[in-house]
Curated annotation (Swiss-Prot):
Residues 345-476 are annotated as: Cytidylyltransferase. Residues 1-319 are annotated as: Ribokinase. One of its GO terms (biological process) is ADP-L-glycero-beta-D-manno-heptose biosynthetic process. PROSITE patterns: PFKB_KINASES_1, PFKB_KINASES_2. Pathway: Nucleotide-sugar biosynthesis; ADP-L-glycero-beta-D-manno-heptose biosynthesis; ADP-L-glycero-beta-D-manno-heptose from D-glycero-beta-D-manno-heptose 7-phosphate: step 1/4; Nucleotide-sugar biosynthesis; ADP-L-glycero-beta-D-manno-heptose biosynthesis; ADP-L-glycero-beta-D-manno-heptose from D-glycero-beta-D-manno-heptose 7-phosphate: step 3/4. GO terms for cellular component: cytosol. The keyword DNA-binding does not apply. This is Bifunctional protein HldE. Catalyzes the ADP transfer from ATP to D-glycero-beta-D-manno-heptose 1-phosphate, yielding ADP-D-glycero-beta-D-manno-heptose. The active site is at D264. Transmembrane segments: none annotated. In the N-terminal section; belongs to the carbohydrate kinase PfkB family. In the C-terminal section; belongs to the cytidylyltransferase family. InterPro entries: Bifunc_HldE, Carboh/pur_kinase_PfkB_CS, Cyt_trans-like, PfkB_dom, RfaE_dom_I, RfaE_dom_II, Ribokinase-like, Rossmann-like_a/b/a_fold.
Amino acid sequence: MKVSLPAFEKARVLVVGDVMLDRYWVGPTGRISPEAPVPVVKINQVEDRPGGAANVALNIATLGGQVQLAGLVGQDDTAIALTLGVQTLGVEPQWLSIADKPTITKLRVLSRNQQLIRLDFEEAFDKADSVRLLKQSEALLDSIDVVVLSDYAKGAIDQPRDFIALARSKGVMVLVDPKGSDFGRYHGASLITPNMSEFEAVVGTVTSEADLLEKARGLLKEHHFDAILVTRSEKGMTLVTANAPELHIPTVAREVYDVTGAGDTVISALATSLAAGADLPQACAIANTAAGVVVGKLGTSTVSRIELIEALALHHGESGFGVVSEDQLAYALEQAKLRGERVVMTNGCFDILHAGHVSYLKQAKALGDRLIVAVNDDASVKRLKGEGRPVNQVDRRMAVLAGLASVDWVVPFSEDTPQRIIARLLPDLLVKGGDYKIEDIAGGAEVIAAGGQVQVLGFEDGISTTAIIQNIMANQ
């Protein structure tokens, strides 16, 4: 499947659920305690990270989405730390403070990248607290595209059916990361994302792929879900919908250090992608890739857009050089910019590649780190050059160009001028051969407006494709 990242900055998401603070105490272990057969950890690092539903919100914000976060907190120092933690990263908190309950905290002690123990500080919230939180959240539905219900069974989401129905009636998609053995609580949700253990807790042991699909479709019908995405660890993900064939997406994780927060990453990437306009299969592929990134990190973590671009390029074959599509080239350029590389771009028909072309392209490449050559397709060459042209089809012209040491990427375009593709890619330097005036070069104004440069290079005298063709015809 070809995967393209949508414009995450357009996504407007509300996350409602169990917020918590993930606290990490880290240090070396050098001896066993004389008091009990346990290691002694000398703490030299303390770190607080927003967890649970707050980690979902942070993932959305890190991808570039606009996100509000509704949850239950206590009136304590932990709530203050959690508030600062989410606000610093661009999340807008919408807390309901409960005086007699602590803000949920999970303390993990780590040494040598291994978790030794986890200590939980929490008390279950009352049902009335959940009712108030969901009622408070209803007022936010008119300004968002997607709701995420992040349920950790701590009491923030008790009976959300009415809230789900109201959101759906307003055209808002509702995604649920479920908990417990009763998925009926989420009746009418757009999508639920159980892991395999959560899925089997509801439907019983899954004995085969066919059994999984049958049981998933049974849940769709029973609870009026639009889709179920079952996350399956090393087996990847399986998407089941009512009106389309199932979709199996293999895992892309290379190394697994810590699965903490992987489910949060999946639903946050789904929500951000869908809110930004991606279709469901695309959103699932993006979420699967994001999960593969985050499990390679230690502790509760987020995934950035740049990390997603790099991972998608690696796993979907879109990071290479040579002949590429526009979308593939857009991915590659984001990586090049991340590496601080200067990108040069030129264009032409290059119908019969000759020594003048080779010299010109070497000059162009010398002006930067990477060179893009945009090539007119066959129809546009015919319109520009007339009958009998091109001599070589576009795939052959691009293959020859891609074989030159000076050329990094070759991309086709179908218009008579490259203005549109140049305006999309916006190289650091646009070059053109001949006696053009800079103001007359297609795409030049867009490059300059974006902070780039435009330069005219000379061709070698006496060498041209037209002259070569005429010489061939004269000698026949």
